[in-house]
Amino acid sequence: MPGVVIVGGGISGLSTAYYLARGGVPSTILESRPRLGGVILTERVEGCTIEAGPDSFLSAKPAAFDLIRELGLADQVIGSNDRDRVTYVRKGGRLVPLPDGLMMMVPTRILPLLTTGLLGWRTKLRMGMELLRAPRPKPGDESVAEFIQEHYGAEAVDYLAEPLLSGIYGGNPTQLSVTSVLPRFVELANQYGSLTRGVLAARAKAGRDRHSAPLFRTLQGGLGQLVEAIAGAIGGKVEVRPCRAQTIQRAEAGFRIKLDDGGWLEADQVVVACEAHSGSALLGGVDGRLAELLGTVPYSSSMTVALGFDAADFTGPGGTPPHGFGFLVPKKERRRLVACTWVGAKFPHRVPEGKVVARCFLGGMEDAGVLDESDEAVAALVASELQDIAGFTARPRFTRISRWPRAMAQYTVGHPQRLAEMQAHTPPTGGLHLAGNAYEGIGIPDCIRMGRQAAERILGIMRPSSV
């Protein structure tokens, strides 16, 4: 009988299996897709490294780099080209750079704020006056939009918070929980009153050495390299079953899992590392309230469209893509394109000389229907909007479209309270564990951390006495 069954072979499930194997506990992964890695998928097209899902991870969160180092891939880690780290926002038909010194939507430098064309004078004045704001701690949760509007006004929500968070979460700031999405900002506001003063104070305490690290990191061969390394490290210690779990039931000693191939598995410990809505469908017979809570987590759908061009054919302003990492498109601009990254500017090694790759994003909570459109319709839509927004008409040499239905969890207002109740229903000694992007962070480091924590809880119970 397998001691541990892990439902889901994405980065959360793989991390759980890796740390269990390192501690001497075998496990079985159930994965319905024909590959491991979940939304992490790297392709090589005409010499270009194309990420169908996430392209990097935040340097500030250590769990990903810690795992990469353990796997012997530290020499494969590269940082983003922060020298060109400028992001543009479309406003009134133009691409306007985000002002220098912006920490998400918090200004930290006066001159760039005064001279930016992205915000009007009323917003600039309000941002300046925000420095005088006194602490006003609030009980309970509120939306990101309410929080940012109270500090900086509605325009800051429309042209900073909304496009930035749409690019990260595919979500709506009027629905997202500020306590879950921007917890550090809530702490700083409670302590200092002014977000700007709080960010500046936190930066001063951290010291200058932290600024030397690039904002984003990735692997030379793409993030698929991480999936391959984990799979190689656990080979022989972990069984991967290419099937779908249909239901989980309590058994006399642990759990029974019914599989879609007609078989059953028994386990002492189960890690639900799939999407929360899939977990909800599995757990109704184990814990009805937990299943109900998991079912309340909304998910956004997204699509990435990678377009490859010959640089000689590129007819944008000045014959090259706009300087910087890419651009964001606020909902107020009434376009379907959410964002676009110039891959070669962010990670130069991923695009050979003479090539240009645009990685475009569509979907989100406001436009999930775009995933149902044909590849031809999507390609035409992206080409039309790139021409309108970035001003070029070059025909792509290749197009790669990736659809991710219901893949990104949304931490809506009240998420901290719901999460606390989920955790109460999954105590460390209860045999049932949750991991994934639906709980305490959506990024790769967050998922790795939660997988490691699930493994540590299990190892505390099942670790062989000889280890």
Where are each of the predicted segments found?
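Conserved Rossmann-like nucleotide-cofactor binding loop
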Residues: 12, 35, 277
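Active-site/ligand-binding neighborhood in enzyme catalytic cores
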Residues: 86, 106, 110, 123-248, ...
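Short loop/edge segments at beta-strand edges and connector loops
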Residues: 8, 81, 241-244, 249, ...
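Conserved flavin/dinucleotide-binding core of flavoenzymes
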Residues: 99-101, 320-323, 336-467
